[in-house]
Amino acid sequence: MMKKNRNKKAMNKQEALFIPHYYRLGHLKNILDGGEYAPYVSPPILESNFIQVNRRGESIYLHNRANWVTVGICSSNPIFKTPNMMLLAHLTPEARKEPEPLFKTLLKSSSSGTLVLTRFIPLQFVTLSVHSAKNMRLKVKLINGRSYYLQLCAPVYKQDIIFSQWVDLIPLLNQEKIKNTKVSEVSSLSELTNSTDIAGSMDITDITAFRELRPRHPKTHRYPCNIMESADFSEYTDVTDVTDVTDVTDMLDNGITDVQDIKIVTEVTEVTEVTEVTEVSEVSDVKMATNISGVKIVFENDDIIKTKQEEKEYTLKHRSLQDTKTKSDYQDSPNPVTMSNIALALQDEGCFQTTQTPVKSKEDIYKEICDETSEENMIRLQNIHLKATESRSTRTDSDISDGELKLGRYLHKQCSSREQSFIHSLGSLPRGFVFLHLLL
């Protein structure tokens, strides 16, 4: 009976120790209930003591002692049900000077004065995960990329329950973090769209705001009116809803009366969405200029635009007719313009003729000259031969014997054969030179 009673008492003590309220509301709760942080932070949902270690599980020592920290999860406002903050607390220097070992001081319940709240980090910038379930080690990764490893430091009979609570709490915190990031992204996008809408409609519809921001210049500058090319306003096509020109008389009464002195002739070709002109029929012959954010837009009469278009079309037609005439004249001319019987000296002292004759080289010209001289020499030889024969024929038959006639024929044949052999051997040399050689 005595043994049974003792066992019952031990079980009751253990059950009393395992009550969640006992270790959930600990030292951090006492600090927060002190009055300094009460209006801003709710009581922590979960609180535990950890020792800072490295990735391999080796403890990190600060001031020759293990660096331990108390971690608590809470919400920044008591109204919020979900936690969104992480609290970090450390021992004061006085508490670290105690002669007892550090592990024993952690197991003992300490007063509220031994802890100091040092960090107050939003869970949006923290990522919690289980690094080692066997060693009861957590990983804390901050938004700047740094990672810290915390190993649970609790009594043996509490370690499993406390660590299981952290394991159950971590996925809930990560889900809330994902939801908050999605909501923040949507809100940021909506703020951006609203800001762009406001910036697009702010002060642009009101022309008086531009007049207040930008001072007016009383002097008007005159420019020459011989500007034929049209100004390109394609860069300013995004200026939508700039002006609603409903009453031109109001614009003229407000002080834009010096428009007639401006003699700029330009064409507004691509500014289609800038203005909505409803009552411009009364001011048909007057040009209206508006100065909006440094851009001058000149409205012209329709007659001027039509005349300009007609002038452009006329010039284009005139140019096309001239081109066609020149082409037809060039095609109708049977013979191209040539320079007949004119020799032009070039760098190499060569000559060419432009009477639709092939260009002759130096060798061809030299051969022609040699042929001409040889023909002249042959004609001279024939004339001399004829004269000799005539003189011989005048002689009487009695004076000329048969032997002399045969001798003259023989000499003539030899001369002709010698001449042919020399011509064949000398090639393109002139025949006059051959004749002189024969005479010698």
UniProtKB/Swiss-Prot annotation:
Annotated family: Belongs to the GARIN family.
Matches recorded under PANTHER family: GOLGI-ASSOCIATED RAB2 INTERACTOR PROTEIN 2, PTHR22574
GO biological process per UniProt: cell morphogenesis; flagellated sperm motility; penetration of zona pellucida; spermatid development
Phylogenetic lineage: Eukaryota, Metazoa, Chordata, Craniata, Vertebrata
Protein name: Golgi-associated RAB2 interactor protein 2
Tissue-specific expression: Expressed in testis (at protein level).
A Pfam family matched in the record: GARIL_Rab2_bd
Self-association and partners: Interacts with CALM1.
GO CC entries: sperm head; sperm midpiece
